């Protein structure tokens, strides 16, 4: 569950290291984002010579959450840390690589480019 002011790791090579959620997209009263949801983030920490710099406001897809993800078969999956992948306005990843595993739930939300770049899909 990601809400405003939540800090997330960045799971791609866009140049950002840490971002902070400043808005959950999908309705004016929406409080929380889950895996596959799009949020607006502010870059809080970035590496030199990256594609993005500190202070940039971008959109991102939540790819890992510390909160449980319940599946239809009754199994539960959770990750150690919250993570997101930065995207542009066309919903394409800014980076060219994705680090770490991503859950299958991204496929249902039509983030196929992220799934194809990920090294492991759980």
From Swiss-Prot:
What the entry lists under Pfam families is as follows: Ribosomal_L14
Is Membrane tagged as a keyword? no
Q: Which UniProt keywords apply?
A: Ribonucleoprotein, Ribosomal protein, RNA-binding, rRNA-binding
- InterPro entries linked to this entry: Ribosomal_uL14 (IPR000218), Ribosomal_uL14_bac-type (IPR005745), Ribosomal_uL14_CS (IPR019972), Ribosomal_uL14_sf (IPR036853)
Q: Which domain of life is it from?
A: Bacteria
On whether Transport is a keyword of this UniProt record, the answer is no
- Annotated Gene Ontology cellular component terms: cytosolic large ribosomal subunit
Q: Name one GO molecular function term.
A: structural constituent of ribosome
Output the GO biological process annotations, alphabetical, semicolon-separated.
translation
Spell out the PROSITE patterns in the cross-references. Answer: RIBOSOMAL_L14
Q: What HAMAP family would the database entry show?
A: Ribosomal_uL14
Briefly state the protein's biological role: Binds to 23S rRNA. Forms part of two intersubunit bridges in the 70S ribosome.
What does the record note on quaternary structure?
Answer: Part of the 50S ribosomal subunit. Forms a cluster with proteins L3 and L19. In the 70S ribosome, L14 and L19 interact and together make contacts with the 16S rRNA in bridges B5 and B8.
Q: Which PANTHER family match?
A: 50S/60S RIBOSOMAL PROTEIN L14/L23, LARGE RIBOSOMAL SUBUNIT PROTEIN UL14M
The UniProt similarity line reads:
Belongs to the universal ribosomal protein uL14 family.
Protein name listed in UniProt: Large ribosomal subunit protein uL14
């Amino acid at each position: 569950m990601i809400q405003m002011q939540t800090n997330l790791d960045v799971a791609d090579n866009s140049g950002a290291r840490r971002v902070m959620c400043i808005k959950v997209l999908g309705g004016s009263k929406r409080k929380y984002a889950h895996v596959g949801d799009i949020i607006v983030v502010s870059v809080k920490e970035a590496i030199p010579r990256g594609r993005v710099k500190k202070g940039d406001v971008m959109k991102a897809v939540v790819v890992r959450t510390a909160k449980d993800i319940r599946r239809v078969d009754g199994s539960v999956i959770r990750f150690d840390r919250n993570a997101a992948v930065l995207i542009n306005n066309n919903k394409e990843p800014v980076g060219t690589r994705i680090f770490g595993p991503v859950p299958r739930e991204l496929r249902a939300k039509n983030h196929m480019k992220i799934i194809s770049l990920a090294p492991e899909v759980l």
